[in-house]
Amino acid sequence: MINTRKNHPLMKILNESFIDLPTPSNISAWWNFGSLLGACLAIQIITGLFLAMHYTSDTSTAFSSVTHICRDVNYGWLIRYLHANGASLFFICLFLHVGRGLYYGSYTFIETWNIGILLLFAVMATAFMGYVLPWGQMSFWGATVITNLLSAIPYIGSTLVEWIWGGFSVDKATLTRFFAFHFILPFIIAAMAIVHLLFLHETGSNNPLGLISDADKIPFHPYYTVKDALGFLLMLFFFLSLVLFSPDLLGDPDNYSPANPLNTPPHIKPEWYFLFAYAILRSIPNKLGGVIALILSILILAIVPFLHNANQRSMIFRPISQCLYWALVADLVTLTWIGGQPVEHPFILIGQVASILYFSIILIFMPLATILENKLLKW
């Protein structure tokens, strides 16, 4: 008898990825976030598709089309808030997923890690362009400020900004192209996620101990399908609680005012998930320096595998590195808070100290801590 699951060309791929996949028997709940990110992407694509059916990417009608979705379309308010808060959920899962990779040394799978960094950049670009689409005050000014940063690039900066804008300011052409890119990027992200999985399945999953687990692997189904389903239900509970009880908690009130180029909001800031990078950008007085620091704040993740000089892969038995890791987490929380504050004393100074600390922990303190830990283990 032929087993279709194992012999059918298409089913075979799915079987080897989600059913008979040999998985370490000791992976914890921190390994749930990969599947949760897949669920987030599915939610975003489905809700986004329904929103795109009613949205118009024209400066004169964009804001009112979003209002129309919320007021006149059946369950339009729900679709809109699922999509807006789905982005926040996506980033919560992303940060936890990257955090888990850093803690347990998953970055030693260099190809998987690098595709992950590209995915992070793609998701950030998609979220930024999506924030512009409702054409509220913060949408317009956020787009103006962030795209204007490219003018810091020597020689070609100003031309590049005008090329992205499609004119001499953020206007109709900008909104139309942002909508086009915002629509196509999630499908590119889905394709990249498949490549991410492809590279992961070449090496197999890491585990909390950071040890080779070939001798002790179990099939993905039913053990981890059930575990992922539980994670998904828990995520859905918190997500729907946010959407149905407090949908505007993470948004900006300024975005309920239509975009007005003649009236600048007192404090321009992006969504909460970009605030840590925004704080790093603002903490450097020089424009070009700020832009470089902004890009490096994410790109620094690509250097992490080359800074790894510990005898153990995971941080689970490395207490000094653990302390530094949690200091880094606290530092990122501080940067997120600072990014949402006005540019005045003492926030400027706190932001500068937190920015220096962010780069110092990753580039200097963590490698030094691993050298010390290696010596202590020998001793």
Curated annotation (Swiss-Prot):
It is a multi-pass membrane protein. The gene is MT-CYB. This is Cytochrome b. Belongs to the cytochrome b family. Coiled coil: none annotated. Heme b b562 binds at residues 83, 182. The cytochrome bc1 complex contains 11 subunits: 3 respiratory subunits (MT-CYB, CYC1 and UQCRFS1), 2 core proteins (UQCRC1 and UQCRC2) and 6 low-molecular weight proteins (UQCRH/QCR6, UQCRB/QCR7, UQCRQ/QCR8, UQCR10/QCR9, UQCR11/QCR10 and a cleavage product of UQCRFS1). This cytochrome bc1 complex then forms a dimer. Heme b b566 binds at residues 97, 196. Pfam families: Cytochrom_B_C, Cytochrome_B. Keywords: Electron transport, Heme, Iron, Membrane, Metal-binding, Mitochondrion, Mitochondrion inner membrane, Respiratory chain, Transmembrane, Transmembrane helix, Transport, Ubiquinone. A ubiquinone binds at residue 201. Its cofactor is heme b. The chain crosses the membrane at residues 33-53, 77-98, 113-133, 178-198, 226-246, 288-308, 320-340, 347-367. GO terms for molecular function: metal ion binding; ubiquinol-cytochrome-c reductase activity. Heme 1 (or BL or b562) is low-potential and absorbs at about 562 nm, and heme 2 (or BH or b566) is high-potential and absorbs at about 566 nm. InterPro entries: Cyt_b/b6_C, Cyt_b/b6_C_sf, Cyt_b/b6_N, Cytb/b6-like_sf, Cytochrome_b, Cytochrome_b_C_euk/bac, Cytochrome_b_N_euk/bac, Di-haem_cyt_TM. Its main location: mitochondrion. Component of the ubiquinol-cytochrome c reductase complex (complex III or cytochrome b-c1 complex) that is part of the mitochondrial respiratory chain. The b-c1 complex mediates electron transfer from ubiquinol to cytochrome c. Contributes to the generation of a proton gradient across the mitochondrial membrane that is then used for ATP synthesis. It comes from Zapus trinotatus. GO terms for cellular component: mitochondrial inner membrane; respiratory chain complex III.
